[in-house]
Amino acid sequence: GKTYTMLGNNHIKNDKSTKIPGLYLLSCIDIFNNLQKKEYSDLEIWVSFYEIYCNKLFDLLNNKNILQAREDGKGNICIAGLVEKNTKNIQELLDIIDYGLTSRTEGITGANLDSSRSHAILQISIRTKQGENYSKISFIDLAGSERAVDTIDTNKKTKIDGAEINKSLLAL
């Protein structure tokens, strides 16, 4: 699925098969390999990770603090209060991603015991050491669309989660 594409099978518990990297790892390797080139020696990597759950933004790198989306004077959307962490190597970046993943909202559905109940946005920003933006890549792991008959747990919260996921997917 979508999360598997992002993570590969490195995050599957008790999986003894050959490890298959996901987009996160493959991208980290490419980014840091390119930073070894002399022409990119002035660049730094910054990472942020947040989720959209029930139409609210939560910072996955800062205790799930609630965030606000705002528009600046130039018409750009920015996330007020979003933590960005500077990282120096692949392992640091992967550790930050792992930390964010442990904070992500999950639940039980008919399809998964640990189904992602939120949309997760991982942003890797590349900036000069003077703070000028050079590039940014965003990975968006969407929550799966939900059919009411697929939810094992029939409590009200699970049904509301499923409806919110479907509503947000429809808006996209």
Regions found by a protein language model. Give the residues of each.
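P-loop NTPase "switch/coupling" elements that transmit nucleotide state to mechanical/effector output
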Residues: 3-171
